[in-house]
Amino acid sequence: MLGNHAEVDIRRTFAIISHPDAGKTTITEKVLLFGQAIQVAGTVKGRGSKQHAKSDWMEMEKDRGISITTSVMQFPYKDCLVNLLDTPGHEDFSEDTYRTLTAVDSCLMVIDAAKGVEDRTRKLMEVTRLRDTPIITFMNKCDRDIRDPMEVMDEVENELKIACAPITWPIGCGKSFKGVYHLHRDETILYQSGLGHMMQEVRIVKGLDNPELDKAIGSELAEQLREELELVIGASHEFELAAFLKGELTPVYFGTALGNFGVDHMLDGLTQWAPKPQPRQTEVREVTSLDSDFSGFIFKIQANMDPKHRDRVAFMRVVSGKYEKGMKMHHVRVGKDVRISDALTFVAGDREQVEEAYPGDIIGLHNHGTIQIGDTFTQGEKLKFTGIPNFAPEMFRRIRLKDPLKQKQLLKGLVQLAEEGAVQVFRPLDNNDLIVGAVGVLQFEVVVGRLKSEYNVEAIYEAINVSTARWVYCKDERKLEEFRRKCSVNLALDGGNNLTYIAPTMVNLNLSMERYPDVAFAKTREN
């Protein structure tokens, strides 16, 4: 067995971020293939296909062919042990995605090289900026007609404010895509189409001036490549590890995930350069991965991962020390010690009990309603990890039951889904309405679908006159009580019983903020 320090050194924990349809799920498949976690990559096919992608395991995801929940997968690659967190890339991803990014040490940004920087990528990059997360970039779909690679890199630099350092460079594109030149290894790796479902035997030509290169790709294309590379090397940044680790520079790889080409080059870079498990801040001190006592935080809760078991699993990022099966942990918020002997490890839907886990690893704890997002577990020290946020929703609906007798099941379902971070639920102080808030429209559909399939509750939405929500705080109890009394028509409790101001319009919110200067109206709430 390796010692704790060595176990930490070999771990890399990262998430994949992208715009919908940039090829994130396909890349996840291919990454797992290289890690030998799955033998035949289950490419994301049309809905009729039996071969569903391994990381899209929830029923709704299988139906739609999109990733709705965050899957967690661990696999070995060369001398490292990689923890990959797959995030929803679809239009309406939820806070789940934001919070997943608090549990990783680096990110892989997947860009469709035909389209360049897209809206969702911008939003996700903003989140990675909050913690200066190191970013590796994969320009995907080079086997299709793509934009000029230099132009796409310029767009990344200008729009995402991060310097680009090309590590590989594409040779041709679309039907004439011949492979990539690796700037650091001074070699050309040739592409063979039609082998996307398996590990390829690759042909490599050493050196840019090698006559073999002219034979392999044709002298015209070889000459064009040499000229292009002169320009590229002159006009782009060189890779600098320090700038990468600060989140200021991204190494760029080109390839095709569907054709299973270039993914291994990116994985080589990730395992070589991405940081090992990093320290995390608590309210009192920084905890490093080399601290000997165990600690970890909950960043996600997933209900009904296994319909046979009707269970809920809390996902924990291990920050320090070592988890051992049967160990006693202190659940800080609750103030109780718990013995954990059945923590889980995952490859998307396939679960097995974990014997031990180290910093950087993600483990699943069975949750019977006692664990919340943001909870800290230690070996006794009263710590609370910070930086795991709730965001004020941007869309609201009133939810109604088709069968009024199922109010109890509806409430239970909504509270559990809210604990997961899929949506937020608000209960107004002055009436019995239930208001659901979400970051995007898809979340509403997801909730109604899951209420029906997992809780046997049929519900419908109605429009409601709510523009935004803010969590309210006031140090002066008397002033808070007066505020509650006078504004009760606009106040509600969220799933965690936190007082929330539900504003019908922005004008109304601004007026209330002026009227009650001692009350803080917050857009985000620390868990």
Curated annotation (Swiss-Prot):
GO cellular component terms given for this protein: cytosol
One of the GO biological process terms: regulation of translational termination
Gene Ontology MF, one: translation release factor activity, codon nonspecific
A Pfam family the protein falls into: RF3_C
Family matches, as InterPro entries: EF-G-like_DII, EFG_III/V, G_TR_CS, P-loop_NTPase, PrfC, RF3_C, RF3_dom_3_sf, RF3_GTP-bd
Subcellular location: Cytoplasm
Sequence positions that bind GTP: 18-25, 86-90, 140-143
CDD domains given in the database record: RF3, RF3_II, RF3_III
Domain of life of the native organism: Bacteria
Domain tr-type G: 9-278
Key words, A-Z: Cytoplasm, GTP-binding, Nucleotide-binding, Protein biosynthesis
HAMAP family (UniProt xref): Rel_fac_3 (MF_00072)
Similarity section: Belongs to the TRAFAC class translation factor GTPase superfamily. Classic translation factor GTPase family. PrfC subfamily.
Role, per record: Increases the formation of ribosomal termination complexes and stimulates activities of RF-1 and RF-2. It binds guanine nucleotides and has strong preference for UGA stop codons. It may interact directly with the ribosome. The stimulation of RF-1 and RF-2 is significantly reduced by GTP and GDP, but not by GMP.
Protein name in the entry: Peptide chain release factor 3
Organism annotation: Shewanella denitrificans (strain OS217 / ATCC BAA-1090 / DSM 15013)
